[in-house]
């Protein structure tokens, strides 16, 4: 029986490259000359910490980071941007969590959606992935298209498609 796995993973090397390119771009920008900002990727916690002189510069750093993520083919849905707060001397700080893997809630939403499509498919949650099996490969391709059209707040990838 044909099957495929639905996962949500983030390439941390590509994320590291996006953060480094964002730092380089910000260093070349005229409005960031002689201003202090920090943009650090914590691979262990899968988080990005941003500190900037003010709220405007913080938003500019976030926008530059998102542009670089798109450039490296990372979906911006994988970034969970927290609200910013003020630290010493008016500086603004925020932390961006990187969503890696499917949560149980998201996985159950996806399986409910698959069941609601009335396609002849079976889905099973296996840790941080969902295994979808069906009798026809066309049904699997159709569910891939339908899942891509939906918004589950995480980027979805389809792996291990077996005929």
Curated annotation (Swiss-Prot):
It comes from the Bacteria. One of its GO terms (cellular component) is cytosol. The keyword Nucleotide-binding applies. Gene3D superfamilies: 3.30.70.860, YajQ-like, domain 2 (3.30.70.990). InterPro entries: DUF520 (IPR007551), UPF0234-like_C (IPR035571), UPF0234_N (IPR035570), YajQ-like_sf (IPR036183). It holds the Pfam family DUF520. GO terms for molecular function: nucleotide binding. Keywords: Nucleotide-binding. Nucleotide-binding protein. Belongs to the YajQ family. NCBIfam families: PRK05412.1. This is Nucleotide-binding protein DehaBAV1_1126. It comes from Dehalococcoides mccartyi (strain ATCC BAA-2100 / JCM 16839 / KCTC 5957 / BAV1).
């Amino acid at each position: 029986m044909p099957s495929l796995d639905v996962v949500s993973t983030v390439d941390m090397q590509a994320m590291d490259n996006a953060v480094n390119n964002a730092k380089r771009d910000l260093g070349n920008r005229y409005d960031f000359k002689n201003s202090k900002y920090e943009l650090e990727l914590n691979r262990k916690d899968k988080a990005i910490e941003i500190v900037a002189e003010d709220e405007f510069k913080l938003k500019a750093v976030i926008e530059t980071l998102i542009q670089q993520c798109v450039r490296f083919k990372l979906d911006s849905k994988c970034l969970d941007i927290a609200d910013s707060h003020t630290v010493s001397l008016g500086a603004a700080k925020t932390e961006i969590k990187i969503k890696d893997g499917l949560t149980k809630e998201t996985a159950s939403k996806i399986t409910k959606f698959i069941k609601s499509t009335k396609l002849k498919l079976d889905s099973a949650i296996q840790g941080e992935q969902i295994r979808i099996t069906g009798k026809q490969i066309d049904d699997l391709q159709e569910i891939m298209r339908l899942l891509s059209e939906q918004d589950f707040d995480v980027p979805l990838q389809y792996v291990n498609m077996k005929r």
